[in-house]
Every structure is written in structure tokens, then in C-alpha cells.
Amino acid sequence: LNCVNHISMKKFLSEDSIDYQNYRFGYCVNIILEENDSIEKAFERGYLPYTGNAKNTEEIYYLARSVRINLNRYVRLSENKRVIKKIKSSLNISVDEHKKEKFNHDNKFEKFCIKYSKERFSNESLSDERLQLIIKRENYNKIYEFKSDNNPIGYVITFSNNNIIHYWFSFYDTKYLESIPIGKFMMEHIINSEKKNNKKYIYLVTSYGRDSMYK
């Protein structure tokens, strides 16, 4: 392990076996953000938040190939407009945006997220401990809540400021996959919404493997 200072961010290098599903790469470049370090700059330089070790509460990021959309160039396709309008009307979907500190991360919410992770995560599902770490991280400050007839059907945990938004973790009721692409709907809604809010970029996490191609 080699630790150095790098543009006011602590940087450390490590070697590991290659396991993309668990965010382990042959040669890992990580940083630890401190109180005055810029989260936006970390994303700009290609780093993503790391929570693989639930016992480590430092603000760790890892360097990885990820997807960034320039929202100035983003245009919603007419076919997408049609599909999205149909989904919203058929399920009577509404979307609420909450600041992290105003949202109730209660037991019902936690069970919803962990249930989704057991059904959909390709690697290890979320533990209670790791979910609590995610909630406490500084790179989470805003959550989107998707409802159908006022019943929660999905959540997206994000970091948002005046310039960017990072689409970090999404959770949804998987029964809707039988009829609609609910995950893609949630992502596209946020992309389009943040374009309207004049954000410059949206970061859509990693892009390793076939399962990430839809991004």
C-alpha cells in the first residue's frame, strides 16, 4: 500500500485480483476525500465512491471506467417520450425529490433496498451494515422516490450540486419488470429532469460487462 498526497486528496495504490463484479481490479487507484475536498472534482477525474468494505467509514473512491452524459447534448428520443408517457399514465407514477436529511430512512425503506439487492445485484447483496454506510456517505445528499398511486415503487440515491448529479444506487419493486422496464424508466426520468435543471453532467456509475450496455 502506497499513500501519497495528490492535489489535496489522499491517494493510495494497491494490487488485487481482477473481479469486476466486486469492483476489484488488477491495479487499483484510490483516493480518500477529506472535509474540504471536492466531490465534483473526484467524479470529474474518473473516481467513483467505494463502499465494498462496510467497516471502513472513510470517504474512499476508486478509479474506474464509468459513464458520463453531457446533458447539453442529451435529447430525449420521440419513442422514449411515448413509452415514458404511457408508463407514467398507466401506473399513475409520481416522483418526489428529498434532501437526505429530510428523508426517513426507516426500517421499511431499508428492507425494500435489501430485498432488491438480493434479487438483482450480480455480486453480494447489501448487508444492513453496508446500507448504513451508503446512507452516511457525504456523496449521498439527495434521494428520488417513485410512487404508483402513492405507494413507493422505487428509490434512487444520488449526489447532486449545481453542476452535476451522480446516479449512485437505484432500488425498485422487481414485480414491475414483468410489464415495464422500470429501472430504465427511473434513470431516464432523472436524466431528463436534471437536464431541465441545467445540470452539466450526469454520472451513471461503472460500465463493465454486457449488463451495463443499456447505459
Model region roles, listed by residue range:
Residues 91-179:
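A conserved beta-strand-loop-helix scaffold within acyl/acetyltransferase catalytic domains
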Residues 194:
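Hydrophobic pocket-lining residues that define ligand/cofactor binding sites across diverse proteins
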Residues 208-215:
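Conserved active-site alpha-helix within GNAT-family acetyltransferase domains
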